[in-house]
Amino acid sequence: LDHKRIGIIYSIMGLWGGLMGLSLSFLLRLNFTDPYYNLIGPEVYNYIITGHGLAMIFFFLMPVIIGGFGNFLLPLLLGMPDLSLPRLNALSAWLMLPSVVCFGISLFIGSGVGWTFYPPLSSIPYTGVGVDYLMFSLHLAGLSSILGSLNFITTIFSSIFSQLSSRISIIIWAYLFTSILLISSLPVLAAAITMLLFDRNFGSSFFDPMGGGD
């Protein structure tokens, strides 16, 4: 697959995730229409808040803006036929599909954890597999973003070394610094989610003060 087709795949995945987030947003606003009658239960409401935020960030904005537009714009602005690592680019694109599927499955299983994955709230009251599906979905989305960022950084640096850096467009620098920030921050989120998964399923105490965790 060339970069244009992969950009289309990213855009389709992003639009799909955006529609999921939009439907969750409609449910939230529908719940606010009558202050004396709650259409949605409190636990499901918490999960919809969590799912809405994650869908808009990880499954709409990042695939469309970074994956979709990036795959179209970077080779065009750099004067290259494709990105430096096309197979890695295809792998990062196809990882979005199981990520979105796991997110969709988690919508119908269990309840959510509110605005954030606050570890005590995620471990004790919410013991269903819905939170685990959502964390696995975040793992896949983060892995896809890291692989795509590595591809962008490799492509941009190989182009910078072959031509004057003053001729590089500012949007290329924006993609470069965004990719560096993603590679720096996403492993921290992945480590925290992994520790939380171990606390929930394997009896560890990374986040449990009673067991020596912090």
What are the functions of these language-model segments?
Residues 1-214:
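Membrane-embedded and interfacial regions of multi-pass energy-transducing membrane proteins
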